[in-house]
A protein has these predicted regions:
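Short, Lys/Arg-enriched N-terminal segments with co-localized hydrophobic residues
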Residues: 1-8
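Small/polar-rich, solvent-exposed N-terminal microdomains that initiate assembly or binding
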Residues: 9-102
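Extracellular/virion structural assembly segments
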Residues: 10-13, 17, 91-92, 113-123, ...
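Catalytic micro-motifs at enzyme active sites that drive phosphoryl/nucleotidyl and oxygen chemistry
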Residues: 70-76, 110-118, 182-189
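Oligomerization/assembly interface segments of phage tail-like spikes and tubes
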Residues: 82-90, 118-134, 143-145, 191-204
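Conserved alpha/beta core surface patches that mediate binding of polyanionic ligands
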Residues: 99-113
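Short, cationic low-complexity segments
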Residues: 108-111, 215-222
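Acidic-leaning, charged glycine-interspersed low-complexity segments
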Residues: 118-120, 140, 149-209, 214-216
């Protein structure tokens, strides 16, 4: 019977947006980063918010390469630094957190019943790239991020919009930081410094939610 129910459920449409939501929440961690511009005396001249976008790192590298081809190309590409980009780079099953697959629990308020099978644990891998023209700008951004991950930062989210009582904790771990400055031109012609921060997030993917309220006993008379 459990096996039969599994095959039936494979034909049931559902979309819980777990990966999409995780990507959005991850990006929101870094959407309020600023750098300060100061004079030689340390007086703040301006504060610049660092733009953040979801995009593959390689697309920014291509645009930075175009910028190095002269002022006309730089105006055409129109990319301003510093800035950041992030992307999801992996979705991997995590067997160490797997609970019995056929377990179900009631995910509905009192008086209703919606059965939800145990979630399947996955590790989502992300990378965040920081692009800057100066080392000081790049380090201002990096040092506003790293201290919050020691090496883990936990996010609390509601995985189902129609089931607000369910809350999931998503541990986000900083796994490494890489530095790249491979431009072979003069110091003045350097196109960009790039820091790449790598993260993992532990979450669960869920199947369809079965509404089984019809079989509930609403009232018992003695």
């Amino acid at each position: 019977e459990p096996l039969r129910r599994c095959f039936i459920m494979l034909g049931t449409y559902f979309y819980n947006k777990r990966v999409r939501t995780s990507v959005s929440i991850f990006g929101s961690l870094f959407n309020d980063i600023h750098v300060l511009r100061t004079d030689s005396n340390g007086k703040v001249l301006s504060q610049v918010k660092v733009p953040l976008s979801y995009a593959p790192k390689r697309s920014f590298l291509e645009r930075l390469e175009e910028m190095s081809q002269g002022e006309e190309a730089e105006r055409r590409v129109a990319i301003k630094l510093p800035r950041m980009s992030f992307e999801i780079i992996g979705i991997n099953y995590d067997p160490q957190r797997q609970l019995p697959k056929m377990n179900t629990f009631n995910a509905a308020p009192i008086g209703e019943r919606k059965d939800l099978y145990t979630g399947v644990p996955y590790i989502l891998s992300f990378q965040l790239a920081v692009y800057a023209k100066s080392q000081d700008d790049a380090l201002q951004v990096v040092e506003q991020i790293i201290p919050y991950f020691a090496p883990q930062y936990t996010l609390s989210v509601k995985p189902f919009s129609d089931l607000p009582d369910i809350v999931e904790d998503i541990p986000v771990t900083l796994t490494g930081v890489d530095f790249q400055d491979d431009y072979e031109g003069s110091f003045e012609a350097r196109r960009a410094l790039i820091y790449t921060l790598r993260f993992t997030a532990k979450t669960y993917l869920f199947g369809s939610i079965a509404d089984t309220s019809e079989g509930l006993i609403r009232k018992v008379q003695a």
